[in-house]
UniProtKB/Swiss-Prot annotation:
UniProt similarity note: Belongs to the herpesviridae ICP22 family.
PTM annotation (Phosphotyrosine): residues: 189
Basic and acidic residues bias: start-end ranges: 62-76
Protein's job: Functions as an E3 ubiquitin ligase and plays a role in the inhibition of innate immunity by preventing IFN-mediated signaling. Induces the ubiquitination and degradation of host STAT1, STAT2 and IRF9, resulting in the blockade of ISGF3 nuclear translocation.
Name of the protein in its database record: E3 ubiquitin ligase ICP22
Parts forming coiled coils: none
Modification after translation: Tyrosine phosphorylated.
Keywords of the record: Early protein, Host nucleus, Host-virus interaction, Inhibition of host innate immune response by virus, Inhibition of host interferon signaling pathway by virus, Inhibition of host STAT1 by virus, Inhibition of host STAT2 by virus, Interferon antiviral system evasion, Phosphoprotein, Transcription, Transcription regulation, Ubl conjugation pathway, Viral immunoevasion
Length: 413
């Protein structure tokens, strides 16, 4: 607490004995003057008290008439600068008895009429702990800092999902198969690969024919192994459309290592020329190829002929290879026509709802446009709207069988 002396003019105009000290700025405490006791009133003359009271009242009246307010400096007040707030860390010592300020006020002739003070929270001195913390921008109270080192937050492993675990096991198994020298049969891996190929072939122009081709391939590979008919390493390279490079070397090494563990059967078949096709070899590994563009060679068979009927016919003749002229030309042509019709009408949706499929105008009469209001009939041959029958069908140009797709049409056998 620092005392600032008042101005000299204020000392000259106001008596020192009767200038009450000003309370601290911002405090709203009601003060009342101390009533003199009987002994003091008898010792002091009445004239002195009356003269001092008149002088102070005249000064206050003059200040009010002038329209200005006396500053604390002119009133002989004191400025308070609390420097103990930044150094104290404990509770302030607040007693129930009168404090030093109260003694000063009482000695100056004033008594402070204030309510009892409440207990305050302990003040915490905020300080920066050390230079590394300051460089890192860490600001926190020193009393909260513990001596134990802060543990580094360890990242928790994500919860393992069934699909992720399954993919991890599959990738580990594939890596083991690649790195392992000995070949082992893995039926689960073969099943997954075949299933993936079936899913890829769903985007083909003819998914059923492509799927049947894959079935033929897996079946022929099994029968070739069952009959102990083996191919040479170079023949396998031509069959898998790899010529030279890392894949060719790996394929030859794997085949030779497996053949060394078994007794040699017949001589390997090596008479397999390269496929005379427009897309062969490395071009098969390039995406976005035209599947329907250009003319194909004789070796490329249409997917339309690979139907379920042809698969069954091939399975019936598994005993031995059939000669080239064994098939009847008429049956072959009839099978091609049947396969073509099956390809065209295989995806035909036979539903009983009107307007569900774009029906052919040559087979089924179009009634949706005639039912629209405000549109005239496009031709005289179109039948006018007839009353509905009990079964919900309409009587049209075909009296024998109603072509409306309700399940009783001539298109359904």
């Amino acid at each position: 607490m620092a005392d600032i002396p008042p101005d000299p003019p204020a000392l000259n105009t106001t008596p020192a004995n009767h200038a009450p000290p000003s309370p601290p700025p911002g405090s709203r405490k009601r003060r009342r003057p101390v009533l003199p006791s009987s002994s003091e009133s008898e010792g002091k003359p009445d004239t002195e008290s009356e003269s001092s009271s008149t002088e102070s009242s005249e000064d206050e009246a003059g200040d009010l008439r002038g329209g200005r307010r006396r500053s604390p400096r002119e009133l002989g007040g004191r400025y308070f600068l609390d420097l103990s707030a930044e150094s104290t860390t404990g509770t302030e010592s607040e007693g129930t008895g009168p404090s030093d300020d109260d003694d000063d006020d009482a000695s100056d002739g004033w008594l402070v009429d204030t309510p009892p003070r409440k207990s305050k929270r302990p003040r915490i001195n905020l300080r920066l702990t050390s230079s590394p913390d300051r460089r890192a921008g860490v600001v926190f109270p020193e009393v909260w800092r513990s001596d134990r080192p802060i543990r580094a937050a360890q990242p928790q492993a994500p919860a393992s999902l069934p699909g992720i675990a399954h993919a991890h096991r599959r990738s580990a198994r594939q890596a083991q198969m690649r790195s392992g020298a000995a070949w082992t049969l893995d039926l689960h891996y073969i099943r997954q690969c075949v299933n993936q190929l079936f899913r890829i072939l769903r985007a083909a122009p003819n998914p059923p024919g492509s799927a049947n081709r894959l079935r033929h391939l897996v079946r022929d590979c099994y029968l070739m192994g069952y009959c102990r008919t083996r191919l040479g390493p170079r023949t396998w390279g031509r069959l898998l459309q790899i010529s030279g490079g890392t894949w060719d070397v790996r394929l030859r090494n794997a085949i030779r290592e497996v053949e060394a563990h078994f007794e040699p059967a017949a001589e390997p078949v090596c008479e397999l020329p390269c496929l005379n096709a427009r897309r062969y070899g490395p071009e098969c590994d390039v995406g976005n190829l035209e599947t329907n563009g250009g003319s194909t060679s004789d070796d490329e068979i249409s997917d339309a002929t690979d139907s379920d009927d042809t698969l069954a016919s091939h399975s019936d003749t598994e005993g031995g290879p059939s000669p080239a002229g064994r098939e009847n030309p008429e049956s072959a042509s009839g099978g091609a026509i049947a396969a073509r019709l099956e390809c065209e009408f295989g995806t035909f949706d036979w539903t009983s709802e009107e307007g569900s499929q774009p029906w052919l105008s040559a087979v089924v009469a179009d009634t949706s446009s005639a039912e629209r209001s405000g549109l005239p009939a496009p031709g005289a041959c179109r039948a006018t709207e007839a009353p509905e029958r009990e079964d919900g069908c309409r009587k049209m140009r075909f009296p024998a069988a109603c072509p409306y797709p309700c399940g009783h049409t001539f298109l359904r056998p």
